[in-house]
Amino acid sequence: MKSFWAEFLEGSNRVLLLQGPVGPFFTHLQDYLVDKQGKTVFKINFNGGDEYYAPISRATFNFVDSKKEFTVYLHHFVVKHQIDAIVCFGDGRIYHKLAKEYCLQSPKMTFWVFEEGYLRPHYITFEKWGVNYNSTLCREQDRFETALYCDTVRENREPKPVLPLAANFSTRAKIAARYYYEIWRKRSDFPNYRHHRETRLP
């Protein structure tokens, strides 16, 4: 059974990153995809926090218009840069919902979503077309158990052990504080930005 991550790496060449989790995760992801996987990767920022961790460059752009204009902006961006995959963190944010709707109408586009891991500590979830309620994963326990058993037998080994990540609240708090401070500090540069918890599709 091929993982979503393997499918993404095999089938995507020109990738657009939207909003990631608070902090530098998407910047590290962009570097990895370019340096280790040979992908062409672009990034769109929506606020000053995004821009702080992913400064404007030849591959990083700021979207400063209203959400009503985002789909048209996205279309022009995709065509100009020949994007074949869009990646984001969480599919409930308004720009991500609009991007998914756009991808569903574009036969050659795919839409990929990171989310905090569902079941196992130290893991992050990565799915095609949606997460949580919008996930396309089967919800039947028997099929999960069968798939896990088949994978274990096929590979003749136990699942790989997890590399634990240190819980570091102070580091995460500093990253988040800086992110939200930059949103406030650069609010005049992004006058139409609204935090995803404050916005809904009409």
Labelled PLM ranges:
Residues 1-47:
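N-terminal subdomain of nucleotide-sugar transferases
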Residues 6-10, 80, 178:
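Polar/charged alpha-helical tracts
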Residues 8-9, 16-18, 29, 33, ...:
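Generic detector of leucine side chains in alpha-helical contexts
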Residues 23-27, 46-144:
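Active-site and donor-binding regions of nucleotide-sugar-utilizing enzymes
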Residues 109-201:
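Active-site-proximal region of nucleotide-activated glycan assembly enzymes
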